[in-house]
């Protein structure tokens, strides 16, 4: 009998490398349990201007890197009809950036976010998770909501004026880490919906402690009062719709004990919220918010008018703010009953209108295609579970039609993608496509490059935020601090504003044209993309400081045309007494 030795030869059996499921889940856990809760003092804003977004993207880059490495190692692409359909949608959403009226530099952020979300979706599809591991993704979201709820309770009851978080204890609308009540409200409502959904899906194990699902009973008690305190109509509507859609599912598939337990928790949450609100000094806020008056009553029709005027090509990606202000100003000039546009509105507070106004028909078709594909996936799931799955999307989708959560909070976008994956895996079977050696190698290379580049960019973004905040809080201003800026890309407008407005103040104070002219040169460029009252106000002063009264009046008329509800007639530069300044300087030098 012959013995064949195969060790060290091509015949040797090669054990399959274990999938990187656990490291991937740990990285997603870090995103939800640590990275998204990071705070750093900032002047407000959206996107990467808020410190929790850079840390969230930084952590997510490692999740994507692990997924790409797994992708390259297994050498096969798992995909289905939804993968292809969403890819087509993303391509269609990207096409208008090639139009002649687009501003690629101003729209690059949303497109990078769009494709990053799609990449995360594809990465999730590559892992063969167990049912428990799939549910763990939903648990991460739920626990993250609970953490934010605890932080919000601390804001509401514990924080004092002048706190390190910059939380306004007078208005006292506990917005958590998000710095915006409606963003917090949709996040809370998502966690509320997930608590009922997960409670139904947990196996009933007798003679076991209830601690495994105790958090799911606590969620309504902790989140619903906060939704009331926040006085967010978006949150109220999302909460009511989600609970209403979930209750039939819980009643049908959960035990009666769990159904009544969760229902009582919802009732307890409403009772706590209403009773606390009634005895609070701010009890009138919720009643005020119940009034449906809102700027959306005229901004939505205005954006719709713009879409109707240019339905095919739109006004150009990245061009919403200047085109909106000019359009509404012209309409107001023709008809005084037409409401002037809102200053500094760079988004119509409706995702469909935003993509439609900027890009025209193709982006709208892309969004409808994606929506139909997801609804078909939901329809393919087990009867009786469809409304519950739809309920998970209600808070974020509803919010996206009333504001812009995806641009304010990265975690909302990531959560939305994970929910898409959850629906997809409930109803889909996958096909496989073998990858070439070159493709596998490239995927492994990208798995190393992406986290390095993203980490560098996000860390320098945080550092720049710190430097600019220190500069803006310094009294008197110390321009030397601005030399420490390491990455002005995200903060370019704010960075330039700090520099040139400081020059302008010095120039007006000392009557030095060499300091005034740089502000004029910069502001004439920025108002093309961001026509805002503050820029026009200072531009009038700058021209007056140079003695160019004709140009100052031209700018004043332009500003009054664009913002007819503001009074620019009182903007006037009063020169300082130069003799007094010289005398003061001489005394300081002696």
Which residue stretches match the model-derived regions?
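A membrane-periplasm/extracellular boundary helix in multi-pass inner-membrane enzymes
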Residues: 230, 250-292, 299, 304-309, ...
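Membrane-interface micro-motifs in multi-pass membrane enzymes
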Residues: 47-59, 106-111, 175-190, 234-235, ...
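Alpha-helical transmembrane segments of multi-pass inner-membrane proteins
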Residues: 2-4, 13, 20-37, 56-68, ...
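Helix-to-loop transition at the C-terminal end of transmembrane segments
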Residues: 41-47, 153-164, 276-288, 312
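Transmembrane signal-anchor hairpin modules in multi-pass inner-membrane enzymes, especially those
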Residues: 1-95, 101-109, 116-123, 127-135, ...
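Interfacial juxtamembrane loops and adjacent helix segments
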Residues: 160-172, 286, 290-293, 305-309, ...
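Transmembrane alpha-helices of multi-pass inner-membrane enzymes
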Residues: 243, 385-440
